[in-house]
Each structure stands twice: as structure tokens, then as C-alpha cells.
């Protein structure tokens, strides 16, 4: 028995209705199972939400549009993991509202920047990036050192995040004022940057035999790139 498709193919309204029905069933098949899961992505073991001061810094990061030039997503590519560390996983950003993965890198990825530079370096860099990176085209943010943190607004933000699943306790929220007393937006932004990558999975060291064999085949990054300018006599 042949199927007669003409009554659908020659009637755009009828065809549109059937397309909508088919797409709806496909969407329900994807969405309904998720509604019965308490949490699709589980947090990493021992993972805790960022502190009040770090959250204030994250708010500054969003307000100043830093995500427009910096991503927070290390892709599972060898070139990226060699530079930044372990590739990003969903559990790291399970409490991020909104997520800041980004889509453009005018500047480097920041997903693993925590601990790579000192607080003083970040302070100078945020005030005037060219003081530490002469070729940088990043704008400075000197006003961050003048603006104090609004503890009441931050506490309200933490309560809102708790309704979305971030496990802030009453003690965390009550301690917001003490945690941010006398702190500037510069302090908060630095604290946030230092928190990035805190729970990143660690890269496993290659077995000794494999590492030796690999070193015979491929020069190590250290053998190709001087560790400092002194090594090249500049």
C-alpha cells in the first residue's frame, strides 16, 4: 500500500501542524525525564559555594562585562589543557547563575587562573593592565578600589541564589556584613579571580615509562620556551 503524502505536502498549514506535533513529542521525551531528577549535574565532592566576598567579586565581574573578553571554559583539546590545565566539567559551574563560560577570548581563559598570580599582581593589573603586560589592550578599572561592598544587597543576592539551589546557610547570609566590612570591589574581584579553578580536577601524571618514551619523541615545553627573559639574555 502506497502512502499518499500529497495532502500534507501541498497544504502548508496541515504540514506545519504535524511538524509541531512531532517536535513536541520529541521535546517531551527529552524534558520529562529531567523533571523527575532532583539534580541533573551533581556538585564535586567537598565542593562549597563561593564566599560572600567572592560572590561580590563575581557580581563586579559580570557588571563590568569581563565575560565578553574572557571565557571560563577550558575545552577538551590538547592545546588548551597543556596551557590551562584539566578541561572544564559541568559540575564546576553547577551553582553558577548565570554561567560565565563565554564565547570569545580577547584575553586568556580564566577558568584556572586562581592561584597563578599573587593578589598584588591582580591589584596592579586591574588598576592598569599595561603596568604588568605592556602589550595588553584590556581597560583599567581603578574605580574598583574606591567602591565599598554593599553587604545588604549581597545578602539579598545570596538568599536569591539559595532559592535556585545554591546551598548557602543562614549563617553564611548572616555573616555577609562581617565578611565584607571595609572591603572594596577591588578586594572582592581579586578574591573571585583567586577562587576560579579551586575544585578543578587534577591532571594525572603520566607513568614514568610512558613519560620517558614521550620525552624521547617530543621536546618538552620547557626545552622549547625559556622559563624567563634572563635565559635569553634580555
Give the role of each language-model region.
Residues 69, 135-140, 200-209:
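Surface-exposed patches in mature extracellular/periplasmic domains of secreted proteins
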Residues 38-62, 74-81, 106, 176-179, ...:
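Electrostatic cytochrome c docking/interface patches
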Residues 181-182, 219-222:
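Low-complexity, proline/glycine-enriched hydrophobic segments characteristic of transmembrane helices
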Residues 15-24, 82-186, 232:
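Electron-transfer interface patches adjacent to heme c in soluble/periplasmic c-type cytochromes
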Residues 57, 63-72, 122, 189, ...:
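The canonical Cys-X-X-Cys-His
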Residues 1-13, 63-73, 95-107:
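Charged, low-complexity, helix/coiled-coil-prone segments
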Residues 32-39, 64-68, 73, 77, ...:
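A generic secondary-structure signal for well-formed alpha-helical elements
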Residues 1-50, 164-169, 190-218, 225-234:
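Post-cleavage N-terminal segment of exported redox proteins
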Amino acid at each position: 500500500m502506497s502512502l499518499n503524502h500529497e495532502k500534507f505536502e501541498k497544504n502548508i498549514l496541515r504540514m506545519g501542524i504535524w511538524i509541531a506535533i512531532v517536535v513536541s513529542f520529541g521535546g517531551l521525551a527529552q524534558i520529562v525525564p529531567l523533571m523527575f531528577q532532583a539534580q541533573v549535574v551533581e556538585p564535586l565532592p567537598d565542593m562549597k559555594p563561593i564566599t560572600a566576598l567572592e560572590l561580590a567579586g563575581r557580581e563586579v565581574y559580570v557588571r563590568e562585562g569581563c565575560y565578553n573578553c574572557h571565557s571560563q571554559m577550558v575545552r577538551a583539546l590538547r592545546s588548551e589543557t597543556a596551557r590551562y590545565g584539566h578541561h572544564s566539567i559541568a559540575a564546576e559551574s553547577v551553582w553558577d547563575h548565570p554561567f560565565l563560560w563565554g564565547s570569545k577570548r580577547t584575553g586568556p581563559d580564566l577558568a584556572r587562573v586562581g592561584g597563578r598570580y599573587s593578589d598584588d599582581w591582580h591589584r596592579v593589573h586591574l588598576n592598569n593592565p599595561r603596568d604588568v603586560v605592556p602589550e595588553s589592550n584590556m581597560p583599567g578599572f581603578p574605580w574598583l578600589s574606591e567602591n565599598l561592598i554593599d553587604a545588604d544587597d549581597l545578602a539579598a543576592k545570596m538568599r536569591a541564589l539559595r532559592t535556585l539551589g545554591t546551598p548557602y546557610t543562614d549563617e553564611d547570609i548572616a555573616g555577609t556584613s562581617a565578611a565584607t566590612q571595609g572591603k572594596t570591589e577591588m578586594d572582592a574581584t581579586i578574591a573571585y579571580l583567586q577562587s576560579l579553578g579551586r575544585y578543578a580536577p587534577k591532571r594525572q601524571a603520566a607513568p614514568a615509562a610512558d613519560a620517558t618514551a614521550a620525552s624521547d619523541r617530543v621536546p618538552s615545553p620547557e626545552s622549547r620556551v625559556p622559563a624567563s627573559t634572563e635565559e635569553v639574555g634580555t
